[in-house]
Amino acid sequence: FVNQHLCGSHLVEALYLVCGERGFFYTPKAXXEAEDPQVGEVELGGGPGLGGLQPLALAGPQQXXGIVEQCCTGICSLYQLENYCN
C-alpha cells in the first residue's frame, strides 16, 4: 500500500481492507449528507451482530480535515486510514 488519492468506492474499499471487522467511521461534511441513507449508513458483511445496515458514527478523529479532504483531495497513508477505524 502506497500513499495515494482514494475517492468514492476506492476509499471505502481501502477502509474495509485496513479496518477489517473493526469497521470504520468518518465525519460527513454537511448535515444534509448525513441524512442520505447511502451516505449515513454502510452495509456490513456477515458475522455475528454485524449483519444489515449500521449507522456510521458522526464524530471523527480530531484532525483539521475529514477523510475525504485528507485522502481524496489530498494523499493519505495506511496509517492515516487507521485513524478512522473503530
From Swiss-Prot:
Disulfide-bond pairs as recorded: C7-C72, C19-C85, C71-C76
This protein's record includes keyword Secreted: yes
GO cellular component, one term: extracellular space
Keywords assigned by UniProt, alphabetized: Carbohydrate metabolism, Disulfide bond, Glucose metabolism, Hormone, Secreted
Secreted found in the keyword field: yes
Any one of the GO BP annotations: glucose homeostasis
Location(s) in or outside the cell: Secreted
SUPFAM superfamilies per UniProt: Insulin-like
Chief place of localization: secreted
Pro-peptide positions on chain: 33-63
Pfam family, one: Insulin
Superkingdom of origin organism: Eukaryota
InterPro entries reported in the protein's UniProt record: Insulin (IPR004825), Insulin-like (IPR016179), Insulin-like_sf (IPR036438), Insulin_CS (IPR022353), Insulin_family (IPR022352)
Role: Insulin decreases blood glucose concentration. It increases cell permeability to monosaccharides, amino acids and fatty acids. It accelerates glycolysis, the pentose phosphate cycle, and glycogen synthesis in liver.
Self-association state and partner proteins as the record states: Heterodimer of a B chain and an A chain linked by two disulfide bonds.
Similarity-based family: Belongs to the insulin family.
Listed name of the protein: Insulin
Source species of the chain: Equus caballus
